[in-house]
């Protein structure tokens, strides 16, 4: 709605708690995968208005927009910019943050070229695209007992492949791609909304690039000064989790 020359997005207050990590179970994981598959099936039938087609179109055979976007994000981290980040982190950050950020920057130096090549190698893969949440992760999935009672914050929703949602969600719920729960989760999803070989490939590379770039995003926010001292402990936890997830990705 529009009020006082501002646009407001209004959403109902959903019951439940984002507590999967505190109480993980196969039943809960299956519940969110079945729900997400149903959401995607409905979204695939969405018919956008002429005005909304830029953001919310559907297409049965198209390249994932996320691939080009992530290639651009990688290209923006030039060697000079990485060197500047290393110098700034060494100078300005306390030890726990400094050590974790420098580890992430080291991973980035070693791996960004390979990740970029994998993204580029899939740009010719054509898959169905339709509105996807694109930022569906642990804290946006609310549980009441074993039931999913809220899937919140659709602000990032835009047309893309279902692999954007699946890689983001499973990366945040499970992390390690070698955890058997990844296979179980995708099997459950596949029962409601079958995945193609191309979509499976996209899930993997979007997870890989998402982990790498999310670490750089937090580092950039720290360098810009947009993180308050009160936020730093939680940001450090996020960065350490990203580094742990990235270590598991090296086995892929």
Feature locations, PLM:
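Alpha-helical scaffold segments in carbohydrate-active enzymes
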Residues: 35-38, 42, 73, 77-80, ...
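All-alpha amphipathic helical-bundle segments outside canonical DNA-binding/catalytic cores
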Residues: 197-207
């Amino acid at each position: 709605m529009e009020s006082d020359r501002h646009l407001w997005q209004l959403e109902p207050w959903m019951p439940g708690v984002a507590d999967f990590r505190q109480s993980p179970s196969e039943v809960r994981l299956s519940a969110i995968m079945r729900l997400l598959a149903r959401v995607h099936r409905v979204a695939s039938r969405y018919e956008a208005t002429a005005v909304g087609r830029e953001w919310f179109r559907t297409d049965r055979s198209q390249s994932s927009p996320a691939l080009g976007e992530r290639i651009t994000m990688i290209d923006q981290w030039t060697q000079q910019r990485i060197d500047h980040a290393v110098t700034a982190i060494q100078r300005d950050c306390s030890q726990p943050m400094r050590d974790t950020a420098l580890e992430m920057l080291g991973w980035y130096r070693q791996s960004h070229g390979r990740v970029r090549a994998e993204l580029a190698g899939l740009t010719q893969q054509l898959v169905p695209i339709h509105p996807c949440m694109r930022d569906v992760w642990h804290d946006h999935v609310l549980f009441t007992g074993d039931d999913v009672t809220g899937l919140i914050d659709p602000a990032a929703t835009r047309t893309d492949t279902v692999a954007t949602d699946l890689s983001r969600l499973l990366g945040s719920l499970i992390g390690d791609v070698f955890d058997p729960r990844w296979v179980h989760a995708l099997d459950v999803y596949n029962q409601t909304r079958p995945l193609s070989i191309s979509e499976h490939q996209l899930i993997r590379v979007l997870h890989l690039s998402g982990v790498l770039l999310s670490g750089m995003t937090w580092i950039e926010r720290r360098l810009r000064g947009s993180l308050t001292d009160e936020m730093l402990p939680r940001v450090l936890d996020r960065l350490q989790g990203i580094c742990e997830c990235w270590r598991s990705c090296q086995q892929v």
